[in-house]
């Protein structure tokens, strides 16, 4: 592991609106449904592809300021690279972006009948130690965990300070009735997945997602685990490159299809990208949250950026994956803050460094600058 650095890794995978009156967007050398092959190819003329070179330079200049500390950028349009710089091919911990990655696996394996998301924890034989679950807590269903509404507020060994501060009292809400961003839910989803499929998360992700969509870097052992005394359910982490996350975002942008093949069920992507209720924390509206994705709801999603249909995966420390269907746009933002020694305590400390609201504000402005660089207004 390299020496600790606090830098931001930004990868932007963009696919500009594919049709106008049924015609491909001007300047694209690939078809509207083009996908990268074994490696990414470059667009040769930015202006013909619908981009302002000057506005992209403005976005890059902001990304390189001390306030955001971007270390790499990758911009992809129509399956080709618009621009790139930095360590977009370096594997780093994705933090809570992991949740949207495992959601895709749940979509695949539930459609094949290996996982029933309507089963309860009791039916699945799920408990915890040293503090066991109550009878009521065991009535939470898998789908309640996927929606962060389990009603189980058990201690966990890895969480941010805000998670611990906002945790409700045990027994205060029944299963399925109250949203709380809960690492216990997310960790137990890892336990259930491996129990029901007989597969390690990394192996399943590699075989069913990474290989089919041509991820260049991900391997099965890029998923690692942390345990601790508070719970028997470990935290699973994904080490993944920005360019591989760009492919994952492109997969979701195309409703789970890759080059004509359905990888993640379309119905699952639909459930993951649409909300029907506003969630909030400490009186602040946050938009929607379904199947481990953050979703625009009621015009609420992210600072300076809220478009109908936008949804995102987010991790502590400014790890972001945005999917923006109305613009055929995918945005990935990474933070290269891997510690020299990987343990739960160190990673938890990194998760609590800086201000989450400040990180979001900085990246929200950067995302707006990038979107404004498109010559389509």
Predicted regions and their residues:
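Bacterial N-terminal signal peptides
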Residues: 7-17
């Amino acid at each position: 592991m390299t020496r600790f650095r606090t830098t931001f890794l930004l990868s932007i995978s963009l696919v500009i609106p594919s049709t106008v009156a049924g015609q491909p967007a001007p300047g694209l050398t690939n078809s509207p449904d083009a996908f990268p092959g074994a490696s990414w190819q470059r667009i040769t003329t930015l202006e013909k592809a619908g981009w302002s070179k000057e506005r992209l330079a403005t976005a890059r200049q902001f990304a390189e300021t001390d306030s955001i500390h971007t270390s790499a950028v990758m911009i992809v349009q129509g399956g080709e690279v618009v621009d790139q710089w930095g360590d977009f091919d370096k594997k780093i911990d994705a933090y809570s972006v992991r949740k949207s990655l495992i959601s895709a696996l749940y979509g695949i394996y539930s459609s094949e009948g290996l996982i029933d998301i309507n089963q309860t924890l009791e039916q699945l034989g799920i408990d915890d130690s040293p503090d066991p679950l109550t009878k009521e807590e065991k009535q939470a269903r898998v789908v309640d965990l996927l929606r962060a509404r389990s009603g189980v507020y058990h201690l966990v060994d890895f969480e941010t300070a805000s998670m611990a501060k906002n945790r409700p009292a045990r027994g205060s809400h029944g299963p399925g009735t109250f949203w709380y961003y809960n690492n216990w839910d997310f960790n137990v989803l890892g336990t259930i997945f491996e129990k029901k499929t007989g597969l390690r998360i990394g192996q399943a992700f590699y075989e069913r997602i990474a290989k089919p969509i041509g991820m260049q870097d991900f391997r099965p052992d890029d998923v690692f685990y942390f345990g601790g005394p508070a719970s028997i359910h470990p935290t699973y982490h994904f080490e993944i490159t920005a360019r591989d996350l760009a492919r994952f975002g492109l997969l979701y942008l195309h409703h789970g299809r890759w080059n004509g093949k359905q990888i993640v069920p379309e119905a699952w992507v639909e459930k993951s990208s649409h909300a029907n209720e506003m969630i909030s924390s400490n009186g602040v509206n946050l938009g929607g949250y379904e199947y481990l994705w953050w979703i625009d709801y009621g015009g609420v999603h992210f600072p300076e950026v809220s478009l109908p249909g936008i949804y995102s995966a987010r991790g502590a420390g400014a790890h972001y994956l945005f999917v923006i269907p109305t613009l055929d746009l995918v945005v990935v933002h990474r933070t290269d803050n891997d510690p020299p020694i990987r343990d739960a305590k160190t990673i938890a400390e990194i998760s609590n460094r800086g201000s989450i609201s400040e990180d979001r504000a900085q990246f929200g402005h950067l995302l707006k600058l990038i979107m404004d660089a498109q010559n389509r207004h």
